[in-house]
């Protein structure tokens, strides 16, 4: 199967019941080892279909607008468009990308908090009217360049975790909302609703209680100025687990019934990103170099094997200047699986994993316990579908990993039963039975 990079058509291997993700990875590890190719992704599109089904079951009252910057792989966007999601776009390129798939402007929101004038004009030109705003300067830019804009006031929430104030960078205070409503009235900018965002790192779901209460206050304020409010955007913040989705729904559902009841004419939307794609993609990387170091050279507080055995530093053919770019702004807590088979009683050694750049920032895993690996061995990282597909840096001649798409026959039939057909709604897809055949000896390895 051809690896997708920017192909016009996406080849998707259909897997029978006897073939699983591990078999697919084994197949491409073998191929890439023979050809000396780079790291690669395997994308299970069936998981995206399942996530959408889960969303419709748990939070059917909330329409998802997928956050495009999370994973803008065209195949992902096309299958989500076929499923009927909206799209939250942060740039001109993202708006153009989803409109090329036939997505109507009414199903696109321009969510960038800091918009270039040229991009506001582009949104006006292509009919993308709904956008977010949290300050007076942005309101004035919108007023001058998009006469048909419909604005969601972005309000701040109280989800600062561990001293991190990332969410306070964007979003106005409740106190400042009246001033912004006054400005919008003077500028003749149409305010149609409110947006807030609660970080996925937030475990205090009481934050949603405060945010929804504040949103209701803004709706009431806006009514005083004569604005017709008809949309509430509760942002992203969904990790992808069914438990978290149910927990959030348990908190917000009764509040939505109170503050924004059904029949009130208010559409409830959200901007899930990693929820849809994180678990759908697996990354395979190759060990290209290794060093043996003394165990006590590792910094204090990191995982050690508690012995006098040596520790190992491994360098991989992908790093923060490629698929692990999000590691620069957030902690990556995942520990990879070792692809090769090893004995259960094989000793484990303190290990550190680095990208290929030799940059001190290019550390992927500070410390973990792994069996001794050799140059040419492969490591498997799960849940790599979010924030992993940006343009790679030209540093060290990095190349974007190939993507191999798959879907089980059962997921494919489920998709057909839902009325999503490749000939009518997913015209760029080519579905074909996979021909992967592996011996028992080549089967997927156990976890490290």
From Swiss-Prot:
Main location: nucleus
Post-translation changes: Ubiquitinated, leading to its proteasomal degradation; a process that is reduced in presence of antizyme OAZ1.
Locations listed in the record: Nucleus
Pfam families the record matches: Orn_Arg_deC_N, Orn_DAP_Arg_deC
GO molecular function: catalytic activity; ornithine decarboxylase activator activity
Gene3D superfamilies according to UniProt: Alanine racemase, Lyase, Ornithine Decarboxylase, Chain A, domain 1
Key words of the record: Nucleus, Polyamine biosynthesis, Ubl conjugation
One of the protein's GO biological processes: positive regulation of polyamine transmembrane transport
Summary of the tissues where the protein is detected: Expressed during testis development.
One Gene Ontology cellular component annotation held by this UniProt entry: nucleus
Site (Not modified): 69
Record text on subunit structure and interactions: Monomer. Interacts with OAZ1 and OAZ3; this interaction disrupts the interaction between the antizyme and ODC1.
Stated family: Belongs to the Orn/Lys/Arg decarboxylase class-II family. ODC antizyme inhibitor subfamily.
Function: Antizyme inhibitor (AZI) protein that positively regulates ornithine decarboxylase (ODC) activity and polyamine uptake. AZI is an enzymatically inactive ODC homolog that counteracts the negative effect of ODC antizymes (AZs) OAZ1, OAZ2 and OAZ3 on ODC activity by competing with ODC for antizyme-binding. Inhibits antizyme-dependent ODC degradation and releases ODC monomers from their inactive complex with antizymes, leading to formation of the catalytically active ODC homodimer and restoring polyamine production.
Protein's recorded name: Antizyme inhibitor 1
Source species: Mus musculus (Mouse)
Protein's gene: Azin1
